[in-house]
Amino acid sequence: MHCLECGLVYIVSGLKVPEKISVRVFVNRIEHPFTHWVKLNAGELLREDEEIILDKVKTGYGSPFVITSLQIGVRRVPSALAEELDTIWARPLNEITFAKRRKIRQKHPMSFENITSTAGTSTASEYLEVVDES
């Protein structure tokens, strides 16, 4: 059992869990957000960033949805069992833009230009070729 006041989970013996659990899914679409109910298997573990499929006929939207947040009571959690959930927050997969990761090279504070030779020794630039990779 999950306590809605303190948030702790207690083990209760003899309690039968139903086969299917109805959980509310709030879909945050750009044009038209909507609420939908989905039936999940008892004991199914859901996590943020997982995909969930809703009924195309009832939602009118055929794209898979990405779980953006899971809500238990008033708390948002990264993962939860189906029977603990109050609300699943989701967005259509085609409305999510993934940030491009740019490869950023940092220059070392001690560049070859700062290395000077002392009497009778050669500089690093005589043995190494400086290549610009940008």
UniProtKB/Swiss-Prot annotation:
InterPro entries: Znf_CPxCG-like. The keyword Plastid does not apply. It holds the Pfam family CPxCG_zf. GO terms for molecular function: DNA binding; zinc ion binding. A zinc finger (C4-type) spans 3-36. Disruption phenotype: Under nitrogen-limited conditions, mutant shows a considerably changed growth rate and a prolonged lag phase. Level of NifH is significantly decreased. The keyword Transcription regulation applies. Induction: Induced by nitrogen-limited conditions. Involved in nitrogen regulation. Enhances the transcription of the nitrogen fixation (nif) operon under nitrogen-limited conditions. Acts by binding to the nifH promoter region. Interacts with the general archaeal transcription factors TBPs. This is Nif-regulating protein A. The gene is nrpA.
